[in-house]
Each structure stands twice: as C-alpha cells, then as structure tokens.
Amino acid sequence: MPCGVSSACCISFSTSSVIWERAFSAETLMPLISASYSTIQKYGLEGDFKLNLEANHATLAGHTFEHEMNVARCYDALGSIDANQGDMLLGWDTDEFPTNIYDTTLAMYEILENGGIAPGGINFDSKVRRSSFEMEDLLLAHIAGMDTFARGLKAAAKLKEERFFDDLKDKRYASYNEGIGARILSDEETLESLTEYSLQNGDIKLESSHLEFVKSRLNDYLV
C-alpha cells in the first residue's frame, strides 16, 4: 500500500533541520532517525506524522540513503525524501543535485517496495555549484536530477520485477525455513537448547555470499 495517510504531515527532527545539522556532528547524527520515530511512537502519533529523509544527511550520518529509507519503510514511516547528494569527502551539507544512478536506483527500489511515497513525495533540495553561475545551469541541473531519478526508477522496477534482491534474501535465509531455523522462528528453542545444538554441530559448512558477483550483477541493471 502507498505510504501515508491523508492527514499525515512530514517531519524530521534529524534529517532536514538546519538546527539539528549544525548542533550535532556527523557521528552524533547517526541515531537521530530512530530517535525521531521513537518520539512519534512515544506520543502515539504514528497516524499523524511520517519522516522526511535527505540523501545528503544520510551521508553526514555515515549511512547510505537506501539504508535510512529501508528503516523508515519497515516502520511505515517513509513520508517524503529530499532528492540530493553530498560530497563524500567534505563532511558538510553540500546539497548537490543528484547524478549518481547507483544511489537513485537503490533509493527508488525502496520507494517501490513501499508502494509509493506520500504524503510528501520527492523534493529537490539541491543547489547548483558555485562555478555553475549561468541561468541555464539551474534548468540543466534540474533536468540532470530528474533524469537520474527516472533512470534509477527504471532500473529499480526491473530489479523488483526480476526479484533480484528477493531471491538473494530467500537464499541467504533459507535455513530458517526448516530444521533449527524454523524452530527458532516459532519460539521452540531456548538459549540452552541452542547452546547444546552448537556444541553438537560444531563443523557447520559456511556458504559464500559471492558479494563481488552480486555487485557486478547489480551493475548490469544500471547500464
């Protein structure tokens, strides 16, 4: 179902407030999204407020944008996003126009998994660079940002249609479908029984994640 209710509005104690941004370092920004939603939960405001997330602020917090969007989505709290990108080296809120298709693909994938994004949608909280001073640069920058998100959406739609991430997760957590894994999920095991199981099954064969191959396959969707 699409994210949002008709009466909801978007807030972000951590993700798009200049006050918060200037008051805290990148290290202390890290837990503030969870703190924001904890405040919403504490006062029973889940039906009234959702979070606005900004890509550049995720960078400052040491997170990926898709990680923060995923966390918000899991709590049904994804209300809007500020579409921009930051400089990975500066440690400040540069609010660049988004041009990284890899990032926008993963961001749009979270939006598709969310069933859409509402009530706020996608906002270009972006600025042209100091050297882009001609009038046409503002138009060209918006075109670049919109095209980047559009290409990200097309790639994300294909990822979702072909169950790229779903199949990876299904395989990774297949051991929870039967045996000891299934019993853990059904609360049939205790710490004592799991300790005993570990002692009796010490030589467990690990499976490779083939992570480099997975990233290579992800690149194929972006071309």
Predicted regions and their residues:
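Sequence-level detector for tyrosine residue identity
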Residues: Y37, Y43, Y75, Y102, ...
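Alpha-helical structural signal in soluble globular domains
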Residues: V5, T39-Y43, V71, Y75, ...
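C-terminal extensions of enzymes
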Residues: S126, S132-V223
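Active-site acidic/histidine proton-transfer and metal-coordination neighborhood
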Residues: M1-L51, H142, N177-I180, S208-L211
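Gly/Pro-rich active-site loop or hairpin
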Residues: A26-S34, T59-M146
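Short, well-ordered coil/turn segments that N-cap beta-strands
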Residues: A8-S14, L45-F49, Y75-G79, G115-G120, ...
